[in-house]
Design a protein with these regions (language model features):
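N-terminal alpha-helical transmembrane segments of multi-pass membrane transport
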Residues: 1-80, 91-97
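Select transmembrane alpha-helical segments in multipass membrane proteins
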Residues: 22-28, 65-73, 145-159, 190, ...
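Membrane-interface loop-to-helix entry segments
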Residues: 24-48, 170-176, 183-191, 195-232, ...
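Helix-loop-helix module between adjacent transmembrane segments
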Residues: 28-33, 75, 104-129, 135-199, ...
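Flexible loop linkers connecting adjacent transmembrane helices
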Residues: 39-65, 88-98, 102, 110-143, ...
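Alpha-helical membrane segments and immediately flanking helix-loop junctions
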Residues: 59-91, 118-122, 127-136, 140, ...
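Selective recognition of specific alpha-helical transmembrane segments in multi-pass small-molecule
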Residues: 107-115, 189-203, 214-234, 296-324
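Low-complexity, proline/glycine-enriched hydrophobic segments characteristic of transmembrane helices
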Residues: 325-447
């Protein structure tokens, strides 16, 4: 399992974690924005009129209204990415990552406009009368590249099963288990049956359910967020300052957060932006293809999707996280081996009464280390002595979730009893199967 996880990390570092990913995604949006004359601004009011029904736009074929198609697409986009994804962007890239999520959304509005228009234009009416569309159709018919269309369809299927479903179901199951002691298997089976009942009814039932759930879900979420923002209203303006102040310089260390470079803010902001609104991913055109609207008008409607999803919902989430200050606070949590490393030497993020770090040089060194820059920080290799779950070995520091871990206890993975004995460590990683608990930053949802 660990080897498979390492493979996924390697794959991520060479795809969404590479320099060309934000360049290609934002670059494509910039190209279409300039080439088409800034349609995300020019047609924004038209999109509102079509969705509200003030402007009539109907085609003779189709199974859903423009609003139903929009909410169906948003039902896949709005979710874990808007909550856990935002928290993860801040955790890895600092507050400045939110700015790059906004940039991704602004240019993603044009990308969405283009892909949805094409997906609707090249849609196909199946023998049973249902409508099918998406990038695989315009790749095959418009570009005459059937093998690429087949590859896209296969990868989209994996994406739908993976990031489209697993994070949401997993996090619901975790919350239900943690807060209400509901077995994870029961939650998974219940949600699976519920989804089956909806999906078996086809696009009409999916669209009907989505058009009712999405507005209600939005109202409940905004209501809860506004309560938190009202309690922390004095920190709203400073939160915006934190986002804009270090956009091109990276985020400085604050609290338990060790800081993030400009490259990390850009990379993770763009990656989480895509995960949030799916602009350029190719999933939305499949949902929008069923609309009765004309192709160009449904493309106009789709402009609203990244705006609502990222500019509005993600911004509210970001303000809740930043204004409450929880992103710099350490919480009791179970440590993940992939997010943990043991270092040589003792490092401290302790502060004086003025809020300044007592050992700023150590923080700067750790800041460089977590950003994979040159530093004098060395990963520990050797043996650790543990007695009744407590580390006896001195002169080491445990990093977890990009923060200095505190109050660490170690237990057996098999029976959960406090561990006593010797642990072997190689390049900062514990070889034995043990569980570690303690205080550290948390990255919110498990994405």
């Amino acid at each position: 399992m660990e080897q498979f996880n390492n493979f996924l990390i390697l794959l991520d570092s060479n795809l969404s974690g590479s320099w060309w990913f934000p360049a290609l995604l934002i670059g494509t949006g910039i190209f279409f924005t300039i080439y088409l004359g800034f349609p995300q601004f020019k047609y924004f009011n038209s999109a509102l009129k079509i969705v509200s029904g003030k402007t009539k736009s109907t085609d003779q074929d189709g199974e859903t209204t423009g609003f139903q198609a929009l909410t169906t697409a948003m039902s896949g986009a709005v979710g874990t990415g808007n909550i856990g994804g935002v928290a993860l962007a801040i955790w890895t890239g600092g507050p400045a990552a939110i700015f790059w999520m906004w940039i991704t959304a602004i240019f993603g509005m044009t990308t969405k406009y283009v892909e949805v228009t094409l997906g609707h234009k090249y849609r196909t009416k199946l023998s049973d009368g249902s409508i099918s569309g998406g990038p695989m159709y315009y790749i095959e018919q418009g570009l005459n590249m059937k093998w690429v269309a087949i590859l896209f369809a296969f990868l989209m299927m994996i994406t739908a099963i993976g990031s489209g479903n697993m994070p949401q179901i997993n996090n619901i199951a975790l919350v239900m288990n943690t807060e209400f002691s509901v077995p994870k298997l029961f939650t998974g089976l219940f949600l699976g049956v519920l989804l089956w009942v909806i999906i078996i009814g086809g696009i009409k039932r999916i669209a009907s359910v989505a058009s009712k759930i999405i507005p209600i879900m939005g109202l409940i979420y905004f209501g809860g967020a506004l309560i938190i923002l009202a309690e922390n209203y004095q920190n709203i303006i400073p939160s915006f300052n934190a986002i804009f102040a270090q956009v091109f310089t990276g985020s400085a260390a604050v609290g338990g957060f060790l800081g993030a470079s400009f490259a990390m803010s850009l990379k993770y902001g763009v990656a989480r932006g895509l995960y949030s609104n799916e602009a350029g991913q190719g999933s939305s055109p499949i949902a929008h293809a069923s609309s009765k609207n004309k192709s160009i008008d449904q493309g106009v409607v789709s402009i609203l999707e990244p705006f609502i999803d990222t500019i509005v919902v993600c911004s509210v989430t970001a303000l809740v996280i930043l204004s409450s200050g929880v992103w710099t606070q350490k919480f009791d949590t179970n440590f993940s081996k992939t997010d943990m490393v043991i270092l040589e030497g003792t490092y401290s993020d302790e502060k004086n009464i003025d809020g300044d770090y007592l050992y700023p040089k150590q923080i700067n060194e750790l800041n460089s280390y977590v950003q994979s820059l040159d530093s004098d920080v060395k990963e520990f290799s050797g043996e650790l002595t543990v007695q009744d779950g407590n580390l006896i070995t001195q002169n080491i520091t445990i990093l977890h979730s990009r923060s200095i871990a505190e109050d660490v206890t170690i237990s057996d993975q098999d029976d959960s009893n406090l561990f006593t004995g010797i642990l072997n460590v190689d390049n900062g990683k514990i070889i034995e199967s043990v569980d570690l608990q303690g205080k550290s930053l948390v990255s919110s949802a498990e994405l």
